[in-house]
Design a protein with these regions (language model features):
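A short, flexible beta-alpha/helix-coil linker loop
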Residues: 78-79, 127-130
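Conserved catalytic-core segment of NTP-binding enzymes
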Residues: 134, 138-142, 146-188
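Flexible beta-alpha connector loops of hexameric P-loop NTPases
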Residues: 95-102, 129-135, 183-185
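The C-terminal output helix
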Residues: 18-31
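Phosphate-binding loop that captures ATP/GTP phosphates
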Residues: 64-122
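C-terminal output helix
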Residues: 8-17
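Walker A/P-loop phosphate-binding motif and the immediately C-terminal alpha-helix
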Residues: 35-78, 84
Length: 188
């Protein structure tokens, strides 16, 4: 476990990354058939930087020394920012899946995801109000199960949600990154 407090300097970040990398080297390599890791980036309140951390984590995992297959999921209920952060035009979003959950498989998922030049694939959130169908915990479990079979890492920008769907994501996650700031609203 590593906790970084601001102000951060490059040496502090580098030391934490090297420690993480050395721990990774100690783990035996998993066979490719193993399920991918789900990393849930959850904010203690809005505006703390969950999207920034999720996007940068996904880009680093996809293009680091040991590139991995990475999916980035924007679970902000409406108007998620991941396509904006990546300058990406997403044609589809997870609302399309919730309407067609019976068709969900690797092929359908592959057609829904937006591909970014850095190597990550993005499942964005709806960018409009009409026709929006919120995912249920069961739907999310199915979506993430398919994505775990397709990718080494599934990074989820969960925003600051605390509903049943968010609880299901936390339960399925291999790792949960709770993003906070040193302010009273974040602690309450």
């Amino acid at each position: 476990r590593e906790f970084l407090t601001p102000p951060l300097d490059a040496a502090q970040i580098q030391a934490a990354l090297e420690k993480l990398h050395s721990l990774d080297d100690e783990q035996p390599a998993a066979p490719r058939s193993a399920r991918g890791r789900i990393i849930n980036v959850l904010g203690s309140k809005g505006g703390v930087g969950t999207t920034t951390i999720a996007v940068n984590l996904a880009v680093e995992l996809a293009g680091g020394e040991r590139p991995a297959s990475v999916a980035l999921v924007d679970m902000n209920t409406l108007f998620g920012d991941i396509p904006l952060f990546l300058d990406l035009k997403a044609e589809f979003h997870w609302g399309e899946i919730t309407k067609n959950i019976d068709r969900m498989d690797n092929i359908f998922m592959g057609k829904i995801l937006a591909k970014h030049p850095c190597g990550i694939q993005v499942l964005s959130s709806p960018a409009y109000l009409n026709g929006h169908v919120a995912p249920t915990p069961e739907t999310i479990e199915h979506i993430l199960g398919v994505m775990q079979q397709m990718f080494d890492f599934v990074i989820i920008d969960a925003g600051q949600s605390t509903n049943d769907t968010c609880l299901k994501i936390v339960q399925m996650a291999s790792d949960v990154l709770l993003v906070s700031t040193l302010s009273l609203p974040c602690l309450s």
